[in-house]
Amino acid sequence: MPIVFEAVSHIYQPGTPFAWKALDDVSLTIPDGEFWGIIGPTGSGKSTLIQHMNGLLRPTTGRVLVDGLDLSDRKTDLRKVRQRVGLVFQYPEHQLFGETIFEDVAFGPRNMQLGAAEVERRVMTALERVGLDPAMKDRSPFGLSGGQARRVALAGVLAMEPRVLILDEPTAGLDPQGRREILDLVGGFARTGMTVVLVSHSMDDVAEYADRVLVMHRGRVHMLGTPWELFARRAELEAIGLGVPAAVALADKLRERGWSIPPDVVTMDEAVAAIRGVLAGRKGADRP
């Protein structure tokens, strides 16, 4: 189920002195089953872009196609689109409202007019997918830890059984362990064939999890490629206020000191493996 942008521009408050072009002639295609990371400076259009992917926003000009459905067409039933494309906002736990975890996660499936048995199946499955014990279903979501509450919010989206999952800074405010757990969950969804789009300010996260990385700047597509292709262009990223993953910075420092580090090192695991390889080579060279 590809998502296609065709020359999309979006203007907030058009026709007023406060008009602002948040997207400017964006064209791209997100293929089925890929994990995309979206990065860019504050105000670059990242959130506006993803809100076009399930019809929360419509283009001022251009077209957005999701599974062949034209989201620019006012006749398109956006409910069908939102059942296929799940969107998880920043701090989604702030949107929890059900008296119980079950009631919260069941909200979406019930709005799809599903039978009680199917709703229960989806809720139980979604809780298991986010690593929560289904036996928790009768607990209040408001007594959970931040990481658990975020999992409940994520389960509420997964219960709709979308084919595309879009996440806007899903680890914001979590401790390192909570961050890793959420990202590992999302990475697991991608490995099952789900299309995942992750908006993040963390270069390390997109380097580790994304198949492709989109860089937005001033509402336009600034760069697009694999993590190692993009982070090899460090000077261009720094020119627009972005950094590189810690592993890339470390690899650059080691190369300056004469270490033979491969050019495609972008994650810390890859950096460790490369360093071990160099050290093993030196140890072998020192043997009589």
Swiss-Prot record:
User: Which SMART domains does the record cross-reference, listed alphabetically?
Assistant: AAA
Q: Which InterPro entries match?
A: AAA+_ATPase, ABC_transporter-like_ATP-bd, ABC_transporter-like_CS, ABC_transpr_CbiO/EcfA_su, ECF_ABC_transporter_ATP-bd, EcfA2, P-loop_NTPase
Pinpoint the ABC transporter domain residues: 3-243
The places in or outside the cell where this protein is found are: Cell membrane
Provide the residue positions that the database annotates as binding ATP. Answer: 40-47
Q: Which GO terms describe its molecular function?
A: ATP binding; ATP hydrolysis activity; ATPase-coupled transmembrane transporter activity
The name under which this protein is listed is Energy-coupling factor transporter ATP-binding protein EcfA2
